[in-house]
Design a protein with these regions (language model features):
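Conserved, helical-rich catalytic subdomain that frames metal- and/or nucleotide-binding sites
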Residues: 3, 8-103, 120-121, 127-131, ...
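Catalytic nucleophile-His microenvironment captured as a short glycine-rich beta-strand/loop
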Residues: 113
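Residue-level recognition of strand-loop junctions within catalytic nucleotide-signaling folds
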Residues: 116-118
Length: 149
C-alpha cells in the first residue's frame, strides 16, 4: 500500500512510514492447518495483558539498519493465543532458529511463520530442515525488498 516499510497502528487502519527494512533472505512456511482470525482476536481480548513487542527498540534498529537488533525486537502478541491452539507454529519457529534464522515469528494471526536470515546459504539449510520435518506444507524462500533504500 505504501510501497515501503510501515507501522500499522490502531486496528491496522493507520499506517506510518518507517525507515527501509534491511535487505535480507526470508523463509516463509505454512503448516497444513487453518486459523480463525476471529477466534484468535476473541481469545486475545480475554487475556489480561498480552505481551507486547519492543516497538521503540525495533524503530531504533530500523533506523540503525541493524538486522540482528531488528530481528531481536520483533514480536507478535497474537502468538500468545495461536501457538497454544496450534503448537506446530512453535515447532516451525524452532526449526528455523535451530537452523540459523536470526529470529522467526508467526505472521499475523497465523498459521504462517517467517524467519529472517543473514545469508542465502543458511536459509537453504533451514528450508531443507523444514521440508524434512514435515511441519510445513508450503515453504518459500524470498528476499526483503524495499525500493526506498
Amino acid at each position: 500500500v505504501m510501497r515501503g516499510t510501515a507501522l500499522a497502528e490502531g486496528i491496522g487502519e493507520k499506517l506510518r512510514p518507517l525507515p527501509a527494512m534491511v535487505k535480507c533472505p526470508v523463509l516463509v512456511a505454512k503448516p497444513p492447518i487453518s486459523v480463525s482470525t476471529k477466534t484468535v482476536y476473541e481469545r486475545l481480548d480475554s487475556l489480561e495483558q498480552p505481551p507486547h513487542p519492543d516497538m521503540d527498540g525495533l524503530l531504533e534498529a530500523l533506523q540503525a539498519r541493524d538486522l540482528n537488533r531488528i530481528a531481536g525486537s520483533m514480536g507478535n502478541i497474537l502468538e500468545s493465543v495461536t501457538i497454544p491452539m496450534h503448537p506446530v507454529i512453535s515447532q516451525i519457529k524452532d526449526v528455523m532458529v535451530e537452523n540459523g534464522a536470526i529470529n522467526a515469528m508467526m505472521s499475523g494471526s497465523g498459521p504462517s511463520v517467517f524467519g529472517l536470515f543473514a545469508d542465502e546459504a543458511t536459509l537453504k539449510q533451514a528450508k531443507r530442515a523444514l521440508r524434512e520435518s514435515g511441519y510445513a506444507a508450503q515453504i518459500y524462500g524470498t528476499t526483503i525488498y524495499n525500493n526506498r533504500r
